[in-house]
From Swiss-Prot:
Gene Ontology biological process terms in this record: photosynthesis, light reaction
Main location: plastid
GO cellular component terms attached to this protein's record: chloroplast thylakoid membrane
Topology of this chain in the membrane: Peripheral membrane protein
Subunit structure: NDH is composed of at least 16 different subunits, 5 of which are encoded in the nucleus.
Protein name: NAD(P)H-quinone oxidoreductase subunit H, chloroplastic
UniProt organism field: Saccharum officinarum
Enzyme Commission identifier(s): 7.1.1.-
Class of the enzyme per the UniProt entry, highest EC level: translocase
InterPro entries assigned to the protein according to its UniProt record, in alphabetical order: NADH_Q_OxRdtase_suD, NADH_UbQ_OxRdtase_49kDa_CS, NDH1_su_D/H, NiFe-Hase_large
Catalysed reaction equations from the record: a plastoquinone + NADH + (n+1) H(+)(in) = a plastoquinol + NAD(+) + n H(+)(out); a plastoquinone + NADPH + (n+1) H(+)(in) = a plastoquinol + NADP(+) + n H(+)(out)
Subcellular location: Plastid, Chloroplast thylakoid membrane
Xref: Pfam families: Complex1_49kDa (PF00346)
Length: 393
């Protein structure tokens, strides 16, 4: 005698929140039928700190230290968008040397962000070795940051009109040495990971997003380019001095987790190419504009002496934001990072709206994990690459 039993009981499981050094304070309420995912509901807001409201009660200079807490693995980009917004609003020109320094720092930060995505992503799939390899190269990048900015993380290096300090003597030679060394590391990653049959089984065809879906969901960054859309703001809407360098947009057409991995690995190669060109072509001249203009216009000649400029230097200048509005954006490692700024003839912004790429990209997660296995959730979530600091703001 055989009995056909049908189990209709569903299981609801909480995944997260985790420590910020791991997957962050993201909570997923997952409905399971055995190991099959029936539904997934992301719960956000555990890391909300009111960053937009804080901006409306601070001048841009006062607000700069806050922004490095959005995406704390790619802080140069949050600083860049924070100074770009008032620069565009008030038509402030920055020296060419400062623009090149910004590009170098941004691309180093992009590599560091992709490295710290790759290591934990592979660890989620069960491969621990790459996790230790990526920290080897990441430490070298942080050594370069420390030499130029004084900080390994949370650099507070960008300023309205330029950067806080020029590159120290010998820094560019060390940067070029790192570029040569890192290219060998990328080859090592690809030999270790890309053709690994176990890795391919876990990522190939998992988390598929078509090009049309990616556009309709408003995805950006590697999430968009891995679905066949060649959209990179450094090419489409150039900022800083990106239009002066020779490099290619990295994209794939498959739209799965493997394609997103390949896009990010390819971007690290292109970032090295941009850094090498910027270091070789960097012009002379000032690294900051507003301070130089202030000293030039100073009526008191004592303000130009050594003691004032180097020993008793006053804080960076503030200025009123005129009654205008604009939207500025940069191509961050995770996608389009934008700021909608509204000025009101005041030192403080009237409105400071942040467009974080991680928040937009995360919205498609429930659709991607439905009808997949429980183990695929970490693969898909890892391939999106989110930092909850910028998601919750």
């Amino acid at each position: 005698m055989s009995l056909s039993l049908k189990r209709k009981d569903l299981m609801i499981v909480n995944m997260g929140p985790q420590h910020p050094s791991m997957h962050g304070v993201l909570r997923l309420i997952v409905t399971l039928d055995g190991e099959d995912v029936i539904d997934c509901e992301p719960i956000l807001g555990y890391l909300h700190r009111g960053m937009e409201k804080i901006a409306e009660n601070r001048s841009i200079i006062q607000y700069l230290p806050y922004v490095t807490r959005w995406d704390y693995l790619a802080t140069m980009f949050t600083e860049a968008i924070t100074v770009n917004a008032p620069e565009f609003l008030e038509n402030i020109q920055i020296p060419q040397r400062a623009s090149y320094i910004r590009v170098i720092m941004l691309e180093l930060s992009r590599i560091a962000s992709h490295l710290l995505w790759l290591g934990p992503f592979m660890a989620d799939l069960g491969a621990q070795t790459p996790f230790f390899y990526i920290f080897r190269e990441r430490e070298l990048i942080y050594d370069l940051f420390e030499a130029a900015t004084g900080m390994r993380m949370m650099h507070n290096y960008f300023r309205i009109g330029g950067v806080a300090a020029d590159l120290p003597y010998g820094w560019m030679d060390k940067c070029l040495d790192f570029c040569d060394y890192f290219l060998q590391g990328v080859v090592e990653y690809q030999q270790l990971i890309t053709q690994n049959p176990i890795f391919l089984e876990r990522v190939e065809g998992v988390g598929f997003i078509s090009g049309e879906e990616a556009v309709n969901w408003g995805l950006s960054g590697p999430m968009l380019r891995a679905s066949g859309i060649q959209w990179d703001l450094r090419k489409i809407d150039p900022y800083e001095s990106y239009n002066q360098f020779d490099w290619k947009v990295q994209w794939q057409k498959e739209g799965d987790s493997l394609a997103r991995y390949l896009v990010r690995v390819g971007e690290m190669r292109e970032s090295i190419k941009i850094i090498q060109q910027a270091v070789e072509k960097i012009p002379g001249g000032p690294y900051e504009n507003l301070e130089a203009r202030r000293f030039k216009k100073a009526k008191n000649p004592e303000w130009n002496d050594f003691e004032y400029r180097f020993l008793g230097k006053k804080p960076s200048p503030n200025f009123e934001l005129s009654k205008q509005e604009l939207y500025v954006r940069v191509e961050a490692p995770k996608g389009e990072l934008g700021i909608y700024l509204v000025g009101d003839d005041s030192l403080f912004p009237w409105r400071w709206k942040i467009r974080p790429p991680g928040f937009i990209n995360l919205q498609i997660l429930p659709q991607l994990v439905k009808k997949m296995k429980l183990a695929d959730i970490m693969t898909i979530l890892g391939s999106i690459d989110i930092i909850m600091g910028e998601v919750d703001r």
